[in-house]
Amino acid sequence: MKRLLLPCVVALSYFSCSLKDNSSAIESYDYSFEIVDSLQIDYLGSLWIIDFDSSSQSYLARGNRDREFMVLDRNGMTLSTLEFPSDGPYALYGPINPIGLRDGEIEFHVMNLGFFRYDFNGNRIWQYKLPFNYFYINGLSGDAIYPLGDAIAFVRPERAEVVTDESLTSIFEGVYGQPILEVIDTVSNVGRETMPFPPNSMYSDGNFNYWMFPTIIRSGKEWILYFRNEMKFWVYQEEGGEVNFDREVSLEVDDAIKPIGVPFEKEEDYSELTENNYPGTIREIYRAKDKILVIYHKGIPEELARQVDRDEASGRRELEKLKQYYVAVFDGEFNLLQNDIPVPKGLIFTTILTEDGEILALKHPDFFETEDDFVVYYKLKLLN
């Protein structure tokens, strides 16, 4: 399963990108990342495709309305529309996040209500409420839950009792270094933690770096973890119900803008001190059969960021246009084959990699400043 933003030169530049010279260690490869097909969905407004389920060959999408979700077939035709209730005996209060598909069922989390499974007709078929008070510091991406033996695993939430003052300092000093996953036996309600915090992360440097936005990609017994503003990721292996650290993998990108951390005593000034700091970051990671593809950008130089008025919509669009996205390609053993492969501009990448090796990305209407009759998703593929 799964997991947003993005000038014009020539129209062709959106569909085919030439390669940048790479180091001699990987110069024997000649990959390109190109649009090979598209998906046009007859829908008025914004429609975000969240996930694809190979067992049912269906997409899950979020529509315009707050709780409007749709199940689409692989051609983009609507199979069913669901609107989760906000009142009544089956009311769901609060944001639904994260949400995805697994084996023909919709799985999601609602803060302080727990985890849910629904069928495509909107019928609730399973619910589990955590046996303690908790919260998440910010939004999540990835799957809502991960089966782990007879238990379920999910990104570890914070207990309410960790809040010791009015600032978030105490929370983050405790978060940095803690295991990533919580594991719960839903019968006995017995819990434990696994997936140790990765070594050599910038979030372990003793500074305040805000929330890590941990994102997990699971493929069989292999788990991949990456954080916001890190140009590397970590691989874990599942064994005996534990998710153990295996290795760190670098994108080997030396010219990315570095993130700025601040001392914890200056935490309240973080936004002001980092106002013009737009560091490089990983946007998505895709695990194919014999390769790993990583979408990333290198950030925006401070001198350019200072020139943009972020209070205006046009300024925010300009910032996105300044971000050039790239692909890094690794083999199945995480050896880097090629990096800095340019990505067509104006796309918002989903977490979806199809069985045909195609990555789904939304054509960003604000980027192109156009009004289309359809919601357009492009299918991109690594070509050699």
Question: What do the PLM-derived regions correspond to, one by one?
Answer:
Residues 46-54, 96-102, 142-149, 211-219, ...:
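Structural signature of eukaryotic scaffold interfaces centered on beta-propeller domains
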